[in-house]
Design a protein with these regions (language model features):
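Short, conserved charged micro-motifs
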Residues: 53-55, 90-95, 176-178, 206
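Gly/Ser/Thr-rich beta-alpha loop segments that engage phosphate groups in nucleotides
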Residues: 68-69, 154
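DPxDG-like acidic metal-binding loop motif
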Residues: 71-84
Length: 216
């Protein structure tokens, strides 16, 4: 697990399957950034999702935070986990506000790359399919470009701190999610997912560099 530093943060690049990378990390005692690589196409379900079956060739795992499913493909998403210990100046007790600062980091990174982005500061807006598909709804701290969600954020909190899991879309097919999850009506669901989320027109390397540069 290569380790380095980005300002006040420890930076690690863990290896393993998507399931292994979603495993608990133990007590959170320092600011930590985990840059995760997707090794195989994987559908990641929210903690409360059940009864989902997909075609062969796509793994299915469950994360420890809520929300809808996310499809991870190699090269299709920049997946970064940000860990903040309880008591840190970035710690926010109010869950509805706790991701705002992180959304602003992503928005600033995108601005450096010439992309105007907006951080959602309102309540969770799941829409019709947000309970099934993460990128079908929008929650606090998540980032929209041109009105379409491009960076999703979920969080898992315990006594030691918070683990924020961020997914910046580098590729997106709402119709594929409709097919994988069997959403109906098919045309309506596909149109909603296609218009509600969008891939960023950039590569992961420059985006990660800009993101790390804006971490407080």
């Amino acid at each position: 697990m290569p380790e380095g530093h980005a300002g006040n943060w420890t930076l690690e690049r863990p290896t393993g399957t998507v399931a292994e990378l979603h495993a608990p990390v133990g007590p959170i005692s320092r600011r930590l950034v985990l840059v995760n690589e997707v090794d195989a196409p994987t559908l990641v379900l929210g903690s409360s999702q059940t009864g989902v079956e997909v075609a062969p060739g796509i793994d299915v795992v469950r994360r420890h935070s809520g929300g809808g499913a996310v499809l991870l493909r190699p090269g299709g998403v920049l997946w970064v986990d940000v860990l903040v210990p309880r008591g840190d100046v970035l710690w926010e007790e109010d869950v509805s506000r706790s991701t705002w600062w992180l959304g602003e980091v992503w928005a600033s990174a995108l601005a450096d790359l010439g992309i105007d982005a907006v951080v959602h500061r309102g309540p969770m807006e799941p829409g019709r399919w947000g309970g099934m598909v993460c990128f079908a709804g929008v929650g606090p701290g998540e980032v929209l470009v041109g009105g379409r969600k491009s960076v999703g954020v979920s969080q898992r909190r315990d006594r030691s701190g918070a683990r924020f899991q961020c997914a910046a879309l580098l590729g997106w097919s709402g119709h594929e999610m409709v097919r994988l999850l069997g959403l109906t009506p098919v045309d309506e669901a596909g149109e909603c997912l296609e218009s509600g989320a969008g891939a960023l027109p950039i590569r992961s390397g420059p985006l990660l560099k800009a993101f790390l540069a804006h971490l407080p």
